[in-house]
Amino acid sequence: MKRTYQPSKVRRARTHGFLVRMKSRGGRSVIAARRAKGRKRLAV
C-alpha cells in the first residue's frame, strides 16, 4: 500500500495557499488569527 502523503507543491498551494484562504470568509479568519498570533508564515 502506498503512503497517503504524496507531496506536490502545486496541489499544496492550490488547497492551502494564501489566495485560496482569502477567497472565503473562513479562510480570511484563519489569516487574521495567524496575523494576530504573530505567525511568520500566514499560509503555505
Curated annotation (Swiss-Prot):
State which gene encodes it. rpmH
Q: Name one Pfam family in it.
A: Ribosomal_L34
According to the UniProt entry, its GO molecular function terms are: structural constituent of ribosome
On whether Membrane is a keyword of this UniProt record, the answer is no
Cite a GO CC annotation: ribosome
Which family is this sequence assigned to? Answer: Belongs to the bacterial ribosomal protein bL34 family.
Instruction: Please give the biological process terms from Gene Ontology that the record holds.
Output: translation
Q: What taxonomic classification does the UniProt entry list for its organism?
A: Bacteria, Pseudomonadati, Pseudomonadota, Betaproteobacteria, Burkholderiales
Signal peptide (UniProt feature, chain positions): none
Keywords (alphabetical) are: Ribonucleoprotein, Ribosomal protein
- Give the protein name, as stated in the record: Large ribosomal subunit protein bL34
Asked whether the keyword NADP is assigned, the reply is no
